[in-house]
Design a protein with these regions (language model features):
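PP2C/PPM-type serine/threonine phosphatase catalytic domain
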Residues: 1-340
Length: 340
């Protein structure tokens, strides 16, 4: 064999060895990346929601929305996103603001590349805030548009809540209720400072003044909260159309009892809205409920491939009742709630 042929053979062997090594490294990186995305546990949840015009208003400025990804990578890295928004502003501006907020947040949240849930939520909220603010500046009829926004990301066995305004998130656990969020309102600040009692705040003519919202300023800083979930927990997101008529003790009686939990989130959401309307229904009313059915810890990375086989039953209640079960593989599941 000539020196030239020997050199070519050596180069070929070296290239083959390098390719094998490269392929092995790439494979190892892919496996490591897959395992890094693997959730430590998987939470089965039942969802029910209802939005209602109320007994007085002509337009429904409330919106709820959520997205439960069917793609394993999105589910593992971003979790499931749920939200309630209560728009404000004349000439249908409130409807537009709440709709823009929910759609923009969901799209931006899942598009963001950050590995931190809070960072992605902050980015998504900033995108929604900027869009609504810019729209309000360009169109005179929408000058005062804005919206509250209360979001919950279900990630593994935790709920990460991002919040602006006076819509609320509650935790119902073992017959007790805890308000997760703190209202961004003038009366809430006065109560916090001791200047008003709760009873005075409820009767104050300034009780509807919001001190922080989406779209009314160039920038907004949401508050963040973390809830460690237990099996049997019930999470409730709602607009102030509910809490303006129902006290926490009313909510826990109607939504936190064993019979209410057994009835399911959809029936409970309808009951809460019904009672709020019976007590006057002065505002639009929106309720979204998450029932934490099971928290299953994953032992092996391979088990993640089977997540989509697990049932994720979904039930929406709008002006007419509709029911949707788990979607086909390869499609994200979302539902947008509105009454127009």
């Amino acid at each position: 064999m000539s020196e030239e042929q020997a050199a070519l053979k050596a180069d070929s062997q070296r290239s083959s060895a390098e390719k094998h090594t490269t392929d092995r490294i790439v494979t190892e990186e892919l496996i490591a990346g897959w395992k890094a995305l693997q959730p430590s546990c998987y939470t089965r949840v039942l969802v029910g929601a209802k939005t209602d015009l109320g007994s007085v208003r002509e337009n429904n400025e409330d919106k709820f929305d959520f997205l439960e990804p069917s793609r394993e990578s999105a589910l593992a890295s971003k979790g499931r996103l749920y939200g309630v928004a209560d728009g404000m502003g004349g000439h249908s501006a409130g409807q537009i603001a709440s709709e823009l907020a929910m759609k923009t947040v969901i799209r931006s949240y899942y598009a963001d590349q950050s590995t931190r849930i809070e960072n992605s939520l902050q980015y998504a909220i900033s995108e929604a805030n900027g869009l609504i603010f810019d729209t309000a500046q360009m169109i005179p009829d929408r000058r005062d548009m804005g919206t509250t926004l209360t979001l919950g990301v279900l990630y593994e066995d935790r709920l990460i809540v991002a919040h602006t305004g006076d819509s609320r998130a509650y935790l119902l656990r073992e017959g007790e209720i805890e308000q997760i969020t703190r209202d961004h309102s003038w009366v809430a600040e006065q109560v916090s400072m001791g200047a008003l009692t709760l009873q005075q705040a409820q009767l104050s003519p300034f009780r509807n003044i919001i001190t922080r919202s989406i779209g009314t300023q160039p920038n907004v800083e949401p508050d963040f909260y973390l809830v460690e979930l237990h099996e049997g927990d019930r999470i409730l997101l709602c607009s102030d159309g509910l809490t303006g008529h129902l006290e926490p003790e009313d909510i826990v009686r109607l939504a936190g009892s064993q019979s209410a939990i057994s009835a399911g989130p959809s029936v409970t959401a309808m009951k809460l809205v019904e009672v709020a309307n019976e007590r006057g229904g002065r505002d639009n009313i929106t309720v979204l409920i998450l029932d934490i059915l099971e928290i299953e810890h994953q032992e092996n990375a391979e088990e993640l491939e089977n997540l989509q086989a697990k049932p994720l039953t979904l039930l929406n209640e709008d002006e007419e009742e509709s029911e949707t079960n788990s979607t086909e593989n390869g499609h994200d599941r979302s539902l947008f709630g509105s009454v127009i």
